[in-house]
Amino acid sequence: MKAPIVILNFKTYLESSGEKALELSKALESVSYESGITMVAAPQTTDIFRINDETNIPIFAQHIDPVSPGGNTGSNLMEALIESGINGTLLNHSEQRMRLADIAEVIQRTKEQKITSVVCTNNIETSAAAATLNPEFVAVEPPELIGSGIPVSQAEPEIVEGTVNKVKEINKKIKVLCGAGIATGDDMKAAMDLGASGVLLASGIILSKNPKTALLDLVSKI
């Protein structure tokens, strides 16, 4: 997937659910077309099929469970999500933590299915551990900064830079994304200057008065 990349995690905000999820996805598609920057939607499972049907942007699941087809009530089945239209998935977000063995299993299955994996981490050490599993992306997000409006790229730049360096030592092909508190063009530029290949963000865009305007500002300095 071409860098720089912006992944918008829709989480479970009402502002990014149902009809508003589609509107947000169309804003991502429009800004991607105008800027030439890869924009990815990570909507709730219920909205994936419609967004895939009505837009041409990449779609990631917010989570996939390490289950096979069968009796797994309430689980997110990879095969069903692919059928609905995903191109990849987030894994181990701070709001949906996973065991290391489960992360490894899902990453292996994403490779078999040829979809992209993004493992979320919270510091340099866990980023290094994630890199040994060979996902396509590691997204570092100190949990105390998530939703805070304080960007990690400026509050704790050493975490971003240290993660980039450590991950590249393990596997140069893995790209690092910067998350937590990202909202503006200055935030994204700071992340890129520290070696990140893009950003993972949510509330800074979703809860803004005009998400498309906020997205345009986000990529304005790249």
Task: For every predicted segment, state its role.
Residues 1-76, 125-134, 206:
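Conserved N-terminal beta1-alpha1 strand-loop-helix module at the mouth
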Residues 11, 44, 81, 141, ...:
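Conserved, mostly hydrophobic/aromatic
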Residues 56-110:
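Glycine/small-residue-rich loop that forms an oxyanion/phosphate-binding "nest" at active or ligand-binding sites
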Residues 63-66, 70-72, 99-101, 119-124, ...:
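Glycine-rich beta-to-alpha transition loops that act as phosphate-gripper elements at the mouths
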Residues 87-98, 138-151, 194-214:
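Glycine-rich phosphate-binding active-site loops on the catalytic face of alpha/beta enzymes
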Residues 106-112, 152-158, 204-222:
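C-terminal helical cap(s) of enzyme catalytic domains, especially alpha/beta-barrels
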Residues 112-177:
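Active-site rim beta-loop-alpha module in soluble metabolic enzymes
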Residues 122-134, 178-199:
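Catalytic cores of alpha/beta
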